[in-house]
């Protein structure tokens, strides 16, 4: 398993992943399918944004199997978004990829916002050094401050 920075040619793969049912169902901000035009605009903006870092997770054969995105949305934290294809889950790949990505960036404060219906993601972030900051009826907010 390896991670690499996104390239322009990754746009279609990310578009396909973001519109998968298993991805949409756990999104906090938008659970509707995204059209390619809106995705292309978003992708171009993210590629040119110094406050965003996106990594493609590849298997040992260099086939893309997921992505990790860090995006600064608040002064103090970079929000974490992870997607891993279904057949690669529960193998420790996401934990390894997250740690690799964290070690490649100069960010020190991370935040994960998780829908309460997504207990698996909540447990994943706890297992990977995040702690509960606060919660409401619909979501948990976990943070990890690297020292």
Regions found by a protein language model. Give the residues of each.
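A short, well-structured alpha-helix characteristic of acyl/acetyltransferase catalytic modules
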Residues: 4-33
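Hydrophobic adenine-recognition pocket in adenosine-nucleotide-binding enzymes
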Residues: 6, 84, 114
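Acetyl-CoA-dependent GNAT
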Residues: 32-81, 85-87, 136
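Conserved acetyl-CoA-binding loop-helix of GNAT-fold acetyltransferases
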Residues: 84, 90-104, 119-127
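Conserved GNAT acetyl-CoA-binding A-motif
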Residues: 105-116
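Conserved acetyl-CoA-binding loop of GNAT-fold acetyltransferases
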Residues: 126-136
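C-terminal "cap" of GNAT-fold acetyltransferases
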Residues: 135-147
